[in-house]
Curated annotation (Swiss-Prot):
General function of this protein: Cytosolic metallopeptidase that catalyzes the removal of unsubstituted N-terminal hydrophobic amino acids from various peptides. The presence of Zn(2+) ions is essential for the peptidase activity, and the association with other cofactors can modulate the substrate spectificity of the enzyme. For instance, in the presence of Mn(2+), it displays a specific Cys-Gly hydrolyzing activity of Cys-Gly-S-conjugates. Involved in the metabolism of glutathione and in the degradation of glutathione S-conjugates, which may play a role in the control of the cell redox status.
Localization of this protein: Cytoplasm
Record flagged with keyword Manganese: yes
Name of the featured protein: Cytosol aminopeptidase
E.C. numbers: 3.4.11.1, 3.4.13.23, 3.4.11.5
UniProt cofactor note: Binds two metal ions per subunit. Two metal binding sites with different affinities are located in the enzyme active site and can be occupied in vitro by different metals: site 1 is occupied by Zn(2+), Mn(2+), Mg(2+) or Co(2+), while the tight binding site 2 can be occupied by only Zn(2+) or Co(2+). One Zn(2+) ion is tightly bound to site 2 and essential for enzyme activity in vivo, while site 1 can be occupied by different metals to give different enzymatic activities. Mn(2+) is required for Cys-Gly hydrolysis activity.
Family listed: Belongs to the peptidase M17 family.
UniProt KW keywords: Aminopeptidase, Cytoplasm, Hydrolase, Magnesium, Manganese, Metal-binding, Phosphoprotein, Protease, Zinc
Gene: LAP3
Amino acid sequence: GVLFASGQNLARTLIEFLLR
């Protein structure tokens, strides 16, 4: 659902930020 997609997007953003 929307919440799941939103959570995935947030997690991806966090991962990319940490791996930057």
